[in-house]
Amino acid sequence: PSLSHNERFIDLFNATVANVPSQIALAQRTADDSWQTITYADLKRQADSAAQWFLEHGADAQTPIMVNSHNSIEHAIIRHAALTIGAPYVPVSEGYALLGAADDYQRLRFVLGLIKPGFIFAQSEHAQEAVLACAPTAQLICADSAIDASFIPLANVINTPVTDELARATERLTADDVTAYMLTSGSTGNPKAVLHTNRMMCQAVAQQKWMMEGTGLW
C-alpha cells in the first residue's frame, strides 16, 4: 500500500488485509510448544469486533486502553481495536505486575494516575492481580481464565457483532490523532508518556520500507 505520511495507520493495516487476507499475520508458542497462528483476515475480524465492543462501552480519544501483557496475538487484537476507533493504546511492561507486589505496585499506580485508562487488558494472572488491586474502577478484560468476576473474557469481546457505528468512528480519524502513549523506562525517575500519532506511525513504516528496498524482504 501507499505509505503517504497523510494516511492513518489503520489504512495501511486494512490495505494489507485486503491484499493478503489468508497470510499468517502473527504466530506464538503455546504451552505445549506448538504454534498458534492468526491470519490477517482473522486479526481484522477480531479487532473490529473488539473495537465495536469498546465503542459500545464508551471508548473514545479521551479513554486510553492500557495493555499489561507480553507480545501476543491477544495483545495485537486489542492494539488494532484501539487504532480502529482512535482510543489511545498504552502498552505497559508485565514487569510492573511481576515485580511490583513487594512495593504495592507503586510504578503501576503512578502510570495509572498519569494515563487514567478507561479500559485495561491483563493477559496473565499476575497482571490481573495487579490491575485489580490498582484500578478496580476501570473496565477490565482478561485473555483466558478470570481471577475475579470484574474481568470480561476476551472471547466475549471479540465476538461482538459489528455495526455501522464502527465505520463512522474509523472515518473520523485523522493523521494527527494520538494513537498511543508510549512509556519511557523511568530509569531516572517515574515513567513519562510519549505521544505517537497516525502520521508518526506511518512515517516509521515508510522508513522501514525504504531501508528494506532491494532486499526482497518487503
List PLM regions with ranges:
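Conserved AMP-binding/adenylate-forming core of the ANL superfamily
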Residues: S22-I77, A97-Q106, N156-V162, H196-R199
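Conserved pre-ATP/AMP-binding loop-to-beta segment of ANL
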Residues: P21-I24, C142-A143, N156-L183, N190, ...
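Short beta-strand elements of ligand-binding domains
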Residues: S69, A138-D148
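Conserved ATP-dependent adenylate/AMP-binding module captured primarily in the ANL superfamily
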Residues: V90-A133, P161-T163, A204-W218
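A short N-terminal helical cap/helix-turn-helix that marks the beginning
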Residues: L3-A27, R45
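Conserved AMP-binding A3 loop
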Residues: T37-A41, E171-R172, T179-A206
